[in-house]
Design a protein with these regions (language model features):
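C-terminal recognition in membrane/secretory proteostasis and scaffolding
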Residues: 1-221
Length: 221
């Protein structure tokens, strides 16, 4: 499992997002933790085709109360993989051979294993190197109507607060680690309080990734 900054492209627009996890056997990756939506209508965009490319984060507009911040990045030259699904739990696709991200494998937590309390997120907020930052999971929603906004995460890391003001656009997909397990991904920031945001259960993203892997295997056979 590894976290890297990526740029997600559609038609004539692009945005910075974060890779949440990668499964090396199938080469399937997952990111964002929410759908890519049309900037004008807010509707989930149908996906015809798309690529992910490496990105270098070269700046940040800090988040403040009432104004969400944003990571600023530039495109790399190498296409890392192709997108296959844009859905409410995130974006999914297949990494090109030879482009596997580095990192060690960790288990994915079941939703009942996620607890309130200390955790960490992995995010790239400058350069290309992902870093761990301290957060607190303050609330967990586990009902049937909470498919995406499953938890509230609060940034407690002074270094991250100094750099970004908290959670900013572009950090969507940042893995949430607790007790040595991948428990979720950051999805949204609270505009009225950039220290806080929503997260999605990693288990939900894994289910979609497994479906993508099964589809890819079927198409290859």
């Amino acid at each position: 499992m590894a976290s890297f900054a990526r740029l997600w492209i559609r038609d004539s627009s692009a945005g910075v997002g974060t890779l949440t996890f990668y499964e090396p056997e199938s080469r399937v990756f997952a990111g964002l933790g929410h759908a890519i939506c049309d900037v004008d209508t807010g509707e989930e965009m149908p996906l015809l085709a798309g690529d992910i490319v490496d990105a270098h984060i070269n700046g940040c507009y800090k988040g403040t109360k009432g104004a969400a911040g944003e990571l600023c990045g530039v495109f790399g030259n190498r296409v890392m993989g192709s997108l296959a699904v844009n859905g409410n739990t995130g974006v999914y696709g297949v990494m090109n051979a030879g482009n596997a991200p580095s990192g060690k494998a960790i288990p994915v937590a079941l939703r009942q294993e996620v607890k309130t309390g200390p955790a960490q997120i992995i995010s790239t907020v400058d350069g290309k190197a992902p870093q761990y930052y301290d957060v607190e999971i303050t609330k967990i929603y586990s009902g049937p109507d909470t498919q995406v906004k499953n938890m509230i995460v609060e940034v407690t890391d002074s270094a991250l607060i100094e750099k970004t003001g908290g959670i900013v656009q572009g950090m969507s997909g940042s893995p949430i680690i607790q007790n040595g397990m991948l428990v979720g991904a950051v999805t949204h920031v609270f505009v009225n309080n950039p220290l806080q945001g929503y997260g999605i259960f990693a288990e939900s993203m894994l289910h979609t990734a497994e479906n993508v892997a099964a589809t890819q295997e079927k198409q290859a056979s």
